[in-house]
Amino acid sequence: WVQECSLSNAPGPSGVYRTEPFTRKDCDAFASEFVGRQGAEIRFGTPDVDYYDSRAFYSDHRTYALWVYYNDHSYEYTDYRVDSELRYSGKGGAITEDDLRAALDKLGIEIPDAASFVAVDESEGRYAFRAECVVEDDVLTNGELVCWVAEGGILYKVDNHLSVSTLHGNAAVISSQEAYERLCAGRFSWRDVPMFNYLSPRQVRVTDCKLEYMTDNKGFHQPVYLFTLSDENDAALRGGTGWTTFVPALAG
């Protein structure tokens, strides 16, 4: 293991945050209100609605498509009223932050004060509002709301994975240095361990480390240290880029 990023011996900020997960009934109520603001309705008991383990799907196949996730209330919305030639043209539209906020407001979407506007890719018409683990008054704002805009400044798709959660309880968090030591000892995400052991890289470069929050199916946002890694398999398996894994940040 080769460390190529700065680490600290200071403990990370304490705290576990939570958003009360949606039930199916909650999802139905949210979806009905959301599409209702667009002048559409949901026909329950028809193929317009489908439920999965982690999310629910709603679409009348003419006006809208909406995915709603139970654990953190995130959702993905597509406006089918915007001509498909515009949506699939590959050419994005230009839009200002104020105009995009106004378009989102018409959909009933509020942007948290902690989120900042970013022009992700203007040629593709992709814009976002992002917040990276911002904590204010025991409220955690994290993630991003991504918008797709067609030529003419027409908003047609919104992926809202910008979560807002409240402090559930304080819990000790290890330092990034201790997380690095656990990483080197193989104590990282169990999903990545089998492939790591199979590939058996000769040398792993640790190029970045940052504290993030992951949401479980009970709505808890728990701290983890996310590491960006690079090894000799990057070119053959990952298009020349590195890979990431995480180490749980709670002490113990």
Enumerate the predicted regions with their spans.
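Preferential activation on post-signal-peptide N-terminal prodomains/segments
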Residues: 1-138, 161-166
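Compositionally biased, intrinsically disordered/low-complexity regions enriched for serine, proline
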Residues: 8-10, 220, 245
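Short, solvent-exposed coil/turn segments at beta-strand boundaries
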Residues: 61-77, 149-155, 221-222, 251-252
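Segments that shape or occlude catalytic/ligand-binding pockets
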Residues: 82-90, 95-236, 242
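Short, low-complexity, Pro/Ser/Thr/Gly-rich segments in the mature regions of secreted, periplasmic
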Residues: 240-252
